[in-house]
Amino acid sequence: PIAGSMVLAAILLKLGGYGIIRMMQILPTTKTDMFLPFIVLALWGAILANLTCLQQTDLKSLIAYSSVSHMGLVAAAIIIQTPWGLSGAMALMIAHGFTSSALFCLANTTYERTHTRILILTRGFHNILPMTSTWWLLANLMNIATPPSLNFTSELLIMSTLFNWCPTTIILLGLSMLITASYSLHMFLSTQMGSTLLNSQTEPMHSREHLLMTLHLIPLMMISMKPELVI
């Protein structure tokens, strides 16, 4: 069910990050060099999840693996235990909570009209539902972390934290962000561009679906304009 996917991606997955923050507070303060294996593992996990996204043909699976890859960055930032790292992790959890939930919602609107989640079979939506394409574009831009979104601010904080801790991590981070941009653009082009396989009887987007997307993306845009609310 789509409601379960949205709650799982937006809230339950982020509770794991919150749990890591709480656990780090009660652990004895040690040098972050002790946590090197865990940080490398988190970044490597993020890259592997991103690479898995590139192989996906199922729309919901792609969005789910995308959530996993972002949580790898969150875990790495939390483990370093610096104010910037914690701020970036908190901001990314909030920003990606909105973004991934919006993407799952859009995937469901696509599924209700095509009755398939295969990317190649859902193409051509911009011809018949242009407003849906606009929502897809905005959600994917947020997922890529384009400025001035909160996703961009949080990833910039995390990148600065990891680079100050160990400059070599910029290679893993850069690779991760490159792959994120690749699969997000692939997802958008696969679902929106090309000639449609649907007949002309496709029902239009309902007001409730527009309202759902507005309630996801407008708060995120407003927080992006005033990030000190969450950072």
UniProtKB/Swiss-Prot annotation:
It catalyses: a ubiquinone + NADH + 5 H(+)(in) = a ubiquinol + NAD(+) + 4 H(+)(out). GO terms for molecular function: NADH dehydrogenase (ubiquinone) activity; ubiquinone binding. InterPro entries: NADH_UbQ_OxRdtase, ND/Mrp_TM. The chain crosses the membrane at residues 1-21, 34-54, 63-85, 89-111, 128-148, 169-189, 211-231. It comes from the Eukaryota. Its EC number is 7.1.1.2. Its main location: mitochondrion. One of its GO terms (cellular component) is mitochondrial membrane. Keywords: Electron transport, Membrane, Mitochondrion, NAD, Respiratory chain, Translocase, Transmembrane, Transmembrane helix, Transport, Ubiquinone. GO terms for biological process: ATP synthesis coupled electron transport; electron transport coupled proton transport. It is found in: Mitochondrion membrane. It is a multi-pass membrane protein. It holds the Pfam family Proton_antipo_M. Belongs to the complex I subunit 4 family. Core subunit of the mitochondrial membrane respiratory chain NADH dehydrogenase (Complex I) that is believed to belong to the minimal assembly required for catalysis. Complex I functions in the transfer of electrons from NADH to the respiratory chain. The immediate electron acceptor for the enzyme is believed to be ubiquinone. This is NADH-ubiquinone oxidoreductase chain 4. It comes from Porthidium ophryomegas. The lineage of its organism: Eukaryota, Metazoa, Chordata, Craniata, Vertebrata.
